[in-house]
Design a protein with these regions (language model features):
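Extended, subdomain-level signal for the structured scaffold at the beginning of enzyme domains
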Residues: 1-119, 132-224
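Conserved active-site segments centered on acidic
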Residues: 128-130
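Conserved, well-structured core segments that form or line functional sites
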Residues: 123
């Protein structure tokens, strides 16, 4: 629950399950980790079983949450400080409503992204998790997104979400902040349309409908 707005927040299921499906179908092993470890909280609107019916058509997530073996993966995660990026081919960060409150100021999350990039790993960031790219800096103090093209949750999507629930959900807007940054190129496509962008080792996805597309770019990059 957001202390600022009182709105329930968490990760967005499709941003986890759809990339998970893409990776495992292509033969990759996937570990799910989190800043603090332990059980993860999902945004209820992203659960296809939720009475709101908002995500009722998300059959990939429905299969995941009804599988005892898969649901365990989000009930007992390792903390990101317990892993080494050198043991992985890529890092994929998912969003939802929560990262604007939980990732934005968390140095551990920023350090994971920078460590992966510095190790020559692919780093993918989707939806509101892209808020970290407003702050994450390389050892030379440059922003990770300096001279890069990237995307994230759009103002048009924030407008829709706020109007849909009748209140402001997020404390700030990624698009507004990104467009104020010098030497970086933030782009968005149509509202809630799949949009994933690759620039070197960095892959970004616009919102929950872009997770699978971002995962496919990761798979493509790993195959090069």
């Amino acid at each position: 629950m957001s202390g600022q707005t009182g709105w329930p927040i968490g990760f967005w299921w499709a941003e986890l399950t759809h990339p998970y499906w893409e990776f495992t179908e292509h033969g990759y092993d996937v570990d799910i980790v989190s800043p603090d470890g332990g059980s993860l909280s999902a945004d209820p609107w992203s659960d296809p079983r939720d009475e709101s019916g908002y995500s009722a058509s998300d059959l990939i997530t429905l299969g995941f949450v009804n599988s005892p073996d898969h649901i365990k993966l989000v009930e007992d995660t390792r903390a990101i400080t317990e892993i080494s990026v050198h043991d992985y081919d890529a890092v994929f960060m998912i969003g939802g409503q929560a990262p604007m409150y939980t990732f934005y100021q968390d140095k551990r999350v920023h350090d994971l992204a920078i460590s992966a990039h510095e190790a020559g790993k692919i780093i993918a960031v989707v939806c509101h998790a892209t808020c970290i790219l407003l702050k994450a800096r390389l050892p030379n103090s440059d922003l990770l997104v300096k001279d890069k093209t990237w995307t994230g949750f759009a103002n048009s999507e924030e407008d829709y979400a706020d109007a849909f629930v009748g209140q402001q959900i997020q404390p700030f807007r990624i698009e507004d902040e990104a467009r104020d940054l010098p030497d970086t190129n933030f782009i968005v496509h149509g509202r809630f349309r799949p949009n994933a962008v690759r620039h070197g080792l960095l892959i970004t996805g616009q919102q929950q409908y872009s997770g699978a597309a971002a995962a496919r770019l990761v798979i493509q990059a790993l195959g090069q």
